Amino acid sequence: MKDIEDLIEKAVELQSNGLISAQIADELNISRETVTWLLTRSKKEEATPAPKDISVDWSSIGKSAKRLHNISLALCDMVLETMEKVNAEVDVVVGIAANGVPLASMMAYELDADFAIYHRKGQGIVHAGHRGTISRNFGSVAGKNCIIVDDVITTGSTSMEVIEQLKEMDAKPRVVTVLVDKKGVDTIYNVPIQSLVRIARVD
């Protein structure tokens, strides 16, 4: 129960710092549904069941450039294995802001590829016709083989959004690579998912 209380405390603190639910979900690597539950749960309401979610804390990796580099090497190895199967080269590594960017930049360096950043619009709040964008300050993706990098897949909605956006820009999304896959799917829109860790709930 201590872990739940810690998550509630962190969620409340982030909210008091002005973050919205989607940003809190990104920061704590949990679903938006879980954030809502944490923020609305009173200490007396023990009967309310928690959403089925798993919190992922990878800060022990994120705070060390050396560890980030070593993890990026493992992700590169998985990407190259996938790219060999489709006989394609990596042209651009696209990091999903904010948590995918450090890994993506290191991977781009290791793979001798261009580097691009995808900024989510509204931090994951979905409105018809409103999506994120590829930053113009970094590599171009048009007509290129793209690798998508993020830290955690929870629902897959961000990966879907990036894949759709890349296809609209005439890019070729080839693989999505993450540290942790909480959704447990092999592909999203026929793009392979490669993760260091895949989590499966057994209920």
Swiss-Prot record:
UniProt keyword annotation of Transcription regulation present: yes
Q: Which residues form the signal peptide?
A: none
PROSITE patterns, alphabetized:
PUR_PYR_PR_TRANSFER (PS00103)
**Transmembrane residue ranges:** none
Report the InterPro entries cross-referenced here.
GfcR-like, PRibTrfase_dom, PRTase-like
Keyword set, alphabetical order: DNA-binding, Transcription, Transcription regulation
The source's domain of life comes to Archaea
> Which Pfam families does the record associate with it?
Pribosyltran (PF00156)
Q: Per UniProt, what is one GO molecular function of this protein?
A: orotate phosphoribosyltransferase activity
Q: For this entry, list what GO says about its biological process.
A: pyrimidine nucleobase biosynthetic process; regulation of gene expression; UMP biosynthetic process
- Which family does the UniProt entry place this protein in? Belongs to the purine/pyrimidine phosphoribosyltransferase family. GfcR subfamily.
Comment on protein domains: Contains an N-terminal DNA-binding winged helix-turn-helix domain and a C-terminal regulatory domain (or effector binding domain) resembling phosphoribosyltransferase (PRT) domain.
Instruction: Enumerate the NCBIfam families for this protein.
Output: PRK02277.1
Q: Output this protein's name.
A: Transcriptional regulator GfcR 2
